[in-house]
């Protein structure tokens, strides 16, 4: 097993044992009623929420390569349909960036 995976699993054990997840508790319904489709670029992991002032529970965040909708019956459309029709989303944002990678 990769050393990075081992470290993540060890951290997760401590995280669960000490109930550190409690501070992230929220419902499945996005408080701001927004869904965001964005790129899965690792540089965006913390940058996008920080740049938009969003936190856990605020929005439904959907990420894929390039932040694209590539098929009319694909997982991105399915996720957006669930967000709108089941979770109360009324606004969808598609957010891209330069130098995707």
Each model region followed by its residue ranges:
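Short HxH-centered metal-ligating active-site micro-motif
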Residues: 56-101
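Short, conserved "active-site rim" segments that organize catalytic pockets and cofactor/ligand binding
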Residues: 1-70
